[in-house]
Amino acid sequence: MRVAIAGAGLAGLSCAKYLADAGHTPIVYERRDVLGGKVAAWKDEDGDWYETGLHIFFGAYPNMLQLFKELNIEDRLQWKSHSMIFNQPTKPGTYSRFDFPDIPAPINGVAAILSNNDMLTWEEKIKFGLGLLPAMIRGQSYVEEMDQYSWTEWLRKQNIPERVNDEVFIAMAKALNFIDPDEISATVVLTALNRFLQEKKGSMMAFLDGAPPERLCQPIVEHVQARGGDVLLNAPLKEFVLNDDSSVQAFRIAGIKGQEEQLIEADAYVSALPVDPLKLLLPDAWKAMPYFQQLDGLQGVPVINIHLWFDRKLTDIDHLLFSRSPLLSVYADMSNTCREYEDPDRSMLELVFAPAKDWIGRSDEDILAATMAEIEKLFPQHFSGENPARLRKYKIVKTPLSVYKATPGRQQYRPDQASPIANFFLTGDYTMQRYLASMEGAVLSGKLTAQAIIARQDELQRRSSGRPLAASQA
């Protein structure tokens, strides 16, 4: 079968990869001139990369890790020590660690929590552990039921002290979905905790050894092309052209950069667009369908990614750091953590600015000033005295609508990958799969979409038999 896919983010590329593996011919159409969607990156005038986000790969990402294995690029993951490292706001410039020993789960997670005496008291640890028991015993069904509560509401329901939220979960909620624990669904945090506690290396983290478009997305493209498929850039989806029965007749691809507008016909069609632009493109004939109406309950969350190049080393820590700043989420010195960005003498900090709803419309200068004020608290030793560290340059990447905002009650709005339109499918981390808004969720959704298309293969081929499948000029 020939399958047209709109969007070359991880979900669209994953879908194409697994369709190609099954002997089908996926053609991916990407609006921009760069691969990756939410993992896109660009080079500046000096040849330095700047990215859409700070992308972390966890041991609890089975589909992502399987993808790396199938592409034979596992060596591109740079695994870090099995730890979680938090800044201590009351002791600027110092850190508190949760170190996971090399013993089976969940004992290693329990040991990591119990051995940290900087952030939680013994009473808080015990109450937190008791509060988690229902999730650990009842598993995913309980985790899904808790979507009715925010994380803060769930903590109170379980009689877990507020200070546990302040010390640990403000930072974790911002890392998971770029919002505070008062807003994030308990399902999101419990899903992460369940994976971290039930899998020995679930919370172990890796960085990619370079920019995602080159080091992860391009190998997928080459894999697809080697099997007869293709990925085309500068090819934005303009319209779903429908048949009389509301099925898809063609993708209308806009003509940009001197290209002609095209009508793309295929046996099956996939939207791998984020949920917000997809809603803008929905044909009137589909808008009354409950399946598509549920998308109105989903909306992307704003996030800002910041890159700061300094004239000296600010830290030698080769790991992700939880800032515990009111403005910043996680950060890392990419000159330590990423092989391609390595610099033994100068730091390049990449930081996630979240929650960003009050800042996404502000100027880059305002955002930089606020960020630098926080940086001076994180690294006070480098910004005092006669020779303070100097910022050489910076890049700020704003994403007004990133992954779907995982507030309570969102699970009911997440659609299945197979739509009620016989030849139309959705893929993306917002579709229903257990890994929520994440790179793992995107890859898994792509795989599930490919499986859904293959399951409808006979029907799809019957529908399109006798019809030319080539592209034509509109």
Curated annotation (Swiss-Prot):
Entry membrane topology: Peripheral membrane protein
A GO CC term attached to the entry: plasma membrane
Main location: membrane
Record localization: Cell membrane
EC number(s) stated in the UniProt entry for this protein: 1.3.5.5
Keyword Oxidoreductase: yes
Activity regulation info: Inhibited by the herbicide norflurazon in a non-competitive way.
Pfam families in UniProt: Amino_oxidase
Pathway membership, UniProt: Carotenoid biosynthesis; lycopene biosynthesis
GO molecular function: phytoene dehydrogenase activity
Biological-process GO terms, alphabetical: carotenoid biosynthetic process; response to herbicide
Record keywords: Carotenoid biosynthesis, Cell membrane, Herbicide resistance, Membrane, NAD, Oxidoreductase
Catalytic reactions on record: 2 a plastoquinone + 15-cis-phytoene = 9,9',15-tri-cis-zeta-carotene + 2 a plastoquinol
NCBIfam families per the UniProt record, alphabetical: phytoene_desat
Function: Also active with phytofluene and 1,2-epoxyphytoene as substrates.
Family the entry assigns: Belongs to the carotenoid/retinoid oxidoreductase family.
Further facts: Can also use NAD(+) and NADP(+) as electron acceptor under anaerobic conditions.
Protein name as it appears in the record: 15-cis-phytoene desaturase
Organism annotation: Synechococcus elongatus (strain ATCC 33912 / PCC 7942 / FACHB-805) (Anacystis nidulans R2)
